């Protein structure tokens, strides 16, 4: 049912949105970026591991569709590394604005490449949501650096490729659990090697910082799984649109957890996004499916 897919996509947006402000809280308590990345994937792998023995034909599925699995995993690496590096060059608000162009990229792919029939109202809601998001985040244009913009775009393309590839795989009846296992196993090994060679996984932190860092790690695992479940039900276009709830959740998290203040423009932008998402929910319920 469409309503179930909508719920999965919206919840994925909420859980993805939790990650930013809670992770920053852990950073403020002394946690490092390396540990945050490694925990994200190892916790997700631990959560999904009990399901592995019950997966029939797991290895044969990986062999048969290896290209798809490698592509979606590469996209997840683009997403993680792009966001991580971008914020070292430009401010967080601008990073999120650039990153959140990924639903527009998905929409373009849906229209021009996969040839989906997208209702004009859905196209309109995409752009009103993005405009609202731009106002809500109120980015500064000071000290723009091309490196930061490039890495934020890398993350955006990574997110878009993940969503589009996921839909392609769902049409081949590839389980969301199979995808989840592959991504998290591969990335656990990949980032452990990369961080060990070129960075540092600092475990010398307080117990409070460690426990708080577990929250975004678990949130990532839940959000990824919900996203993988949403796409086969409502399609890549609608899933991308509903994931706009992610930055709005991040804004509320920043206000509630980090005591940041919202300006009148940010409140207006937040209202536009929420109204657009509510309208999208209604429209999507009226449309059986956007994809063939």
Spans of model-derived segments:
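Hydrophobic/small/kink-forming positions within alpha-helical transmembrane segments
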Residues: 17, 21, 73, 77-81, ...
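C-terminal transmembrane-helix exit sites in multi-pass transporters
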Residues: 47, 52, 83-85, 102-127, ...
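Hydrophobic/aromatic residues within transmembrane alpha-helices
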Residues: 26, 36, 40, 86, ...
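Hydrophobic alpha-helical transmembrane segments of multi-pass integral membrane proteins
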Residues: 3-8, 34-50, 125-128, 150-154, ...
């Amino acid at each position: 049912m469409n309503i179930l897919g909508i719920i999965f996509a919206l919840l994925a947006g909420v859980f993805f949105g939790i990650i930013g402000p809670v992770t920053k809280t852990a950073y403020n308590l002394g946690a490092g970026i390396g540990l945050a990345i490694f925990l994200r994937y190892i916790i997700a792998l631990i959560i999904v591991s009990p399901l592995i023995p019950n997966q029939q034909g797991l290895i044969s599925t990986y062999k048969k569709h290896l290209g798809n699995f490698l592509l979606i995993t590469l996209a997840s690496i683009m997403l993680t590394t792009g966001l991580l590096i971008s914020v070292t060059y430009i401010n967080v608000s601008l990073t999120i604005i650039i990153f959140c162009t990924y639903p527009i990229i998905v929409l373009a792919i849906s229209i021009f490449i996969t040839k989906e029939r997208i209702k004009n109202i859905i196209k309109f809601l995409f752009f009103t949501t993005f405009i609202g998001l731009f106002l809500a985040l109120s980015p500064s244009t000071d000290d723009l650096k091309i490196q930061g913009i490039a890495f934020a775009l890398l993350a955006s393309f990574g997110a878009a490729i993940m969503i589009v590839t996921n839909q392609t795989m769902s049409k081949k009846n590839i389980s969301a659990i199979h995808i989840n296992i592959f991504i998290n196993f591969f990335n656990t090994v990949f980032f452990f090697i990369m961080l060990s060679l070129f960075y540092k996984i600092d475990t010398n932190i307080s117990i409070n910082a460690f426990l708080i860092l577990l929250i975004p790690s678990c949130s990532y695992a839940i959000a990824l799984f919900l996203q993988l479940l949403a796409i086969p039900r409502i399609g890549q276009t609608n899933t991308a649109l509903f994931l706009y709830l992610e930055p709005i959740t991040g804004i509320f998290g920043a206000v509630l957890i980090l005591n940041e203040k919202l300006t009148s423009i940010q409140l207006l932008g937040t209202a536009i996004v929420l109204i657009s998402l509510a309208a999208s929910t209604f429209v999507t319920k009226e449309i059986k499916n956007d994809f063939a």
